[in-house]
């Protein structure tokens, strides 16, 4: 039954629907009012270019235009699970009034053009439709589908996902050839270079990249596996931000730094475009290396967020003074600072197999703009199907363990709730995630994936769960 449902939604019209985005989205202005119940996080488009080994001077001249598109459909189900009680932001059983089905459908056009020497412009109109379990994105520290929204969005909504300018300044070194791809024009560049991007995009387009786990449309779907779960990256309620990113490529090293806007009120659409009051600063250093003849990379990230947020301790103190349950929504008294760091490692074992690992941490004293995670460790592996004559298939297996701070634990134990979690009580244990998937290439550009996730202590509550999630995903790209 599940297979019939997803296959019925794949159909050949996916390509036509994807391309048809260009017309309606260009008509819709970004100034249109947007329902705040919108995307939590957008699937990233990696900024690190795909580079051929060396540029050949007789190659074609720089590409002037680029058009690509994608469409992804994900359907999921969950089992009934142990649930002695629940609260306002709990993941619910079907018997408790929550549907056991969830789906997402996205379609994006990636349009690019060369403006001048080293100058490029990119625009991404996008469509989204879908709903989380029960219509609200609640009940987990790290959600099981990276394309999920904060609320139901039926019928589809159209919007401008990205619109930004990129300027590349050569600094010498060997000449390399950048391959054509989404938000990437083909052409020669200096291996040592400075790249500046300005406009609207997603934070994860630039930061926390990993070859083996970075895109929920094609790889692992759980937030704690395709990203640093404790990284408080800048994002409005749709998962996008505004700002400036600088990238310095020098030999085997890459340094990235950015100031990016966050909402003036947490988890809304209103970004502070001044970049002087509500923002996130982040710096990431990457080193590319070879280990036993196989490529790998190590990335270190530091971030600092300043925004109008409540602290858990202020909410607890206010609740005690008023004799009420603590509530972060009534304890936003001014600007707060949240900071943290992360480590990201990828390593090829051979041409078909790769390993990845991430560690991230934040101080966890304030409400979150992203996920209710203050510390997270994840690792896993992916394997191509060459050994069974399916070289474009991929199987993945990953594990993550997430935690929250002592102040958030105390807040939740007193009956408080955040944007995403709150069971009215809490028997704290770390949330654990096991995910495995198999992605099969059924046509040249069409991939079908089966996904399974087992989550223990959902929303850090040992009194509830574990929960099993079953998913099917169809992804097409042109």
Feature map (PLM): residue ranges:
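Surface-exposed coil loops of outer-membrane beta-barrel proteins
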Residues: 137-155, 159, 172-280, 284, ...
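Residues that define the transmembrane beta-barrel architecture of outer-membrane proteins
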Residues: 63, 101-107, 156-161, 238-242, ...
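N-terminal periplasmic/intermembrane-space "pro-region" immediately following the signal or transit peptide
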Residues: 2, 7, 21-99, 110, ...
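Transmembrane beta-barrel strands of outer-membrane/channel proteins
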Residues: 71-75, 123-127, 196-200, 257-261, ...
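Outer-membrane beta-barrel "beta-signal"
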Residues: 35-38, 162-174, 397, 466-478
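Outer membrane beta-barrel transmembrane domains
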Residues: 284-286, 301-335, 356, 363, ...
């Amino acid at each position: 039954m599940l297979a019939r449902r997803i296959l019925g939604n794949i159909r050949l019209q996916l390509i036509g629907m994807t391309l048809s985005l260009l017309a309606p989205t260009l008509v819709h202005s970004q100034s249109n009012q947007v329902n705040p119940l919108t995307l939590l996080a957008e699937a990233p488009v990696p900024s690190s270019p795909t580079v051929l080994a060396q540029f050949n001077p007789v190659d074609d001249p720089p590409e002037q235009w680029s058009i690509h598109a994608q469409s992804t459909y994900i359907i999921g189900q969950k089992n009934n699970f142990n649930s002695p009680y629940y609260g306002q932001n709990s993941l619910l059983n079907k018997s408790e009034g929550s549907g056991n089905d969830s789906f997402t459908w996205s379609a994006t056009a990636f349009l690019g053009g060369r403006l001048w020497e080293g100058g490029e412009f990119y625009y991404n109109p996008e469509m989204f439709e879908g709903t989380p379990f029960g219509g609200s994105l609640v009940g987990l520290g790290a959600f099981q589908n990276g394309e999920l929204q904060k609320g139901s969005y039926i019928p589809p909504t159209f919007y401008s996902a990205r619109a930004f300018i990129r300027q590349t300044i050569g600094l010498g070194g060997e000449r390399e050839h950048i391959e054509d791809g989404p938000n990437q024009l083909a052409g020669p560049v200096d291996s040592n270079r400075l790249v500046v991007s300005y406009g609207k995009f997603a934070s994860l387009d630039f930061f926390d990249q990993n070859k083996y786990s970075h895109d929920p449309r094609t790889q692992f779907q759980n937030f704690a596996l395709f990203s640093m779960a404790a990284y408080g990256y800048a994002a409005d309620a749709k998962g996008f931000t505004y700002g400036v990113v600088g990238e310095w490529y020098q030999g085997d090293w890459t340094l990235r730094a950015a100031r990016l806007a966050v909402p003036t009120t947490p988890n809304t659409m209103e970004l502070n475009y001044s970049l002087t009051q509500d923002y996130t600063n982040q710096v990431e250093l990457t080193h590319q290396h070879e280990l036993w003849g196989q490529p790998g990379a190590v990335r270190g990230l530091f971030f600092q967020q300043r925004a109008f947020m409540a602290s858990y301790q202020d909410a607890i103190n206010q609740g005690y003074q008023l004799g009420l349950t603590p509530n972060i929504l009534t304890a936003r008294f001014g600007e707060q600072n949240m900071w943290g760091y992360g480590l990201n490692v990828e390593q090829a074992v051979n041409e078909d197999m790769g390993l990845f690992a991430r560690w991230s941490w934040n101080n966890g004293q304030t409400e979150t703009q992203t996920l209710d995670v203050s510390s997270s460790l994840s690792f896993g592996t992916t394997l191509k199907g060459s050994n069974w004559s399916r070289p474009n298939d991929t199987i993945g297996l990953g594990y993550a363990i997430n935690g929250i701070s002592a102040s958030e634990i105390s807040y939740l134990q007193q009956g408080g709730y955040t944007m995403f979690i709150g069971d009215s009580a809490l028997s704290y244990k770390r949330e654990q995630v096991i995910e495995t998937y198999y992605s099969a290439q059924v046509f040249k550009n069409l991939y079908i994936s089966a996904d399974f996730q087992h989550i223990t202590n959902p929303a850090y509550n040992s009194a509830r769960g574990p929960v099993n999630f079953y998913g099917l995903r169809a992804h097409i790209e042109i």
